[in-house]
Amino acid sequence: MEVIRKTFFKKSRLEETSLEEIQLILASASPRRLALLAQIGLDPHQVYATNIDETPKLREHPANLAKRLAKEKALKAQETFLWRDQSSGEKVSAQKIVILAADTVVAVGRTILPSPESEDEAYECLRFLSGRAHKVYGAVCALNECGKITVKLVESCVRFRRLTSPMMEAYLYSGEWQGKAGGYAIQGKAGAFVVYIAGSYSNVVGLPLAETMDLLTAYHYPLLTHWNGKTH
């Protein structure tokens, strides 16, 4: 059957491997998620920066928002890495692929905190988190070339110490809040704000690794061969 192939694949790592190898595509340009994948020995064949509307729906629960956005990111990447067969109209791929997408939502109760775009927004996030417990909802989604899609949700609980004005001002000055859900990075200076954490630490950073491993295994991605080099 005749297939129209997207030129996106030209000069990419996808062309450097055999058709039998499953290609891992990360639907995120987040340096934190790339670093977490590298921590478990994974280097995606492609990194695709998705551009979707992340505005919460009216009265949408933070957990549902995380799951919806992770799924939408995977489906957005699917539009690039799969193409329609002219005869059947179905989306197909000449490669075996697994698209991995994730989203992180920080919330106090049902109040969703943004990824602040200004120091004022970041200050309000820190002030709101000061001395309180909050939830970090992490959703990870896998989608393969056959259209099989699975979403896993992870919930972590984090409590901040009471933050003084000098603490918040110094953290804002560091710039570490930029691009971070809830306006902080637990793996950075804000780790000194955390007095308690329950659940997955890697989820708070940006990608729940245990659940990611489970998903990739379920999609027959040979994760362990990246550790031991064995093919069987």
Swiss-Prot record:
Predominant place of localization? cytoplasm
One GO cellular component, as annotated = cytoplasm
Annotated active site: 103 (proton acceptor)
Is Manganese there in the keyword field?
Answer: no
Places the protein is found = Cytoplasm
Q: Which cysteines are joined by disulfide bonds?
A: none
Class in the EC hierarchy, top level: hydrolase
Query: What terms describe the molecular function in GO for this protein?
Result: dTTP diphosphatase activity; UTP diphosphatase activity
Its annotated function is as follows:
Nucleoside triphosphate pyrophosphatase that hydrolyzes dTTP and UTP. May have a dual role in cell division arrest and in preventing the incorporation of modified nucleotides into cellular nucleic acids.
The protein, known as: dTTP/UTP pyrophosphatase
- The protein's organism comes out as Bartonella henselae (strain ATCC 49882 / DSM 28221 / CCUG 30454 / Houston 1)
